[in-house]
């Protein structure tokens, strides 16, 4: 019963965020992303695949609605046994802010692979929105939002 209640609440809108800085938005996104990933992966292990993918896409759309400007089109969904974002393991290593644009760089510490992410944000009406997240490696930057 509790599981159903939590899932029916969904995600709050960007205006409901208690995040006033780019760093706070990034950390909140990491937390919500990890929750979405873990729920989607667990359901994928237990339920029918097509229904799970529809629910995962719905959850992803809610995440995008919460953290991006209206009309943003994200990348195809991807979830797995280990979340790509987790505020307990992915640490902010730099923040650059110039008026209404911010770049927050993070490092995700893992045993065999420690990816770097670059969160790009823009500010509109006193609210910071994600505009893209790039996975950064030696070969370039790859959009992942």
Mark where each language-model region is.
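Short beta-strand edge/turn micro-motifs at domain boundaries
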Residues: 114-144
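Short, aromatic-enriched amphipathic alpha-helices that serve as compact interaction elements
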Residues: 20-40
């Amino acid at each position: 019963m509790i599981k159903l209640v939590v899932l029916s609440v969904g995600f709050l809108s960007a205006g409901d965020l208690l995040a006033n800085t780019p760093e706070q938005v990034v950390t909140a996104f990491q937390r919500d992303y990890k929750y979405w990933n873990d729920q989607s992966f667990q359901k994928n292990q237990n339920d029918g695949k097509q229904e799970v993918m529809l629910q995962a896409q719905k959850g992803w759309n809610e995440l995008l609605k919460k953290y991006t400007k209206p009309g943003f089109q994200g990348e195809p969904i991807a979830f797995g046994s280990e979340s790509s974002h987790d505020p307990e393991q992915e640490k902010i290593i730099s923040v650059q802010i110039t008026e209404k644009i911010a770049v927050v760089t993070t490092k995700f510490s893992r045993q065999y692979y420690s990816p770097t992410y670059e969160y790009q944000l823009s500010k509109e009406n006193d609210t910071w929105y994600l505009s893209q997240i790039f996975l950064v490696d030696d070969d370039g930057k790859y959009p992942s939002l």
